[in-house]
């Protein structure tokens, strides 16, 4: 645990291990009696998983960072595991979650009005009756917006719907973000995915943007 008078931080590093079937190393053989034997190869894999809870006492905001996990390990399980670990002295359930659903819609709308800080590569919106629509541009360098058919569907659905997913490229800005960075907002899981290694300054800038537009 690290802390200053304005910002405590709780970090954890955990070794995670699992076995994964690798077909390329499977073999076949026979018993002395001629019976077939199938040898299945399992590779012992390990990662060191970093988790950090950061609480800014000045703004009374916090964020939980989890390093990238392999597909078989669920982020929600790691989050619960960490919460249980610190629960005797830090009740994380007391913190309210940022509404990523609304942030997705607001960032898209900001772009559509010509004031965007992001470029949307794709989005998914769910209606009040649990029906969803999604759209995606043909390349990350092209906005999903710009055609009447897509724009009108977004406008209609966003009026009463919620943003389930936003696939954004954060645009370069003076003093913080030097080049485009793809960040995916998963509203249905309250999760922000950084798709490339990013330093703390960039992470904080993007999280602040999301807070400001939720």
Q: Language-model features: where?
A:
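Intrinsically disordered, low-complexity, charge-rich terminal extensions
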Residues: 1-214
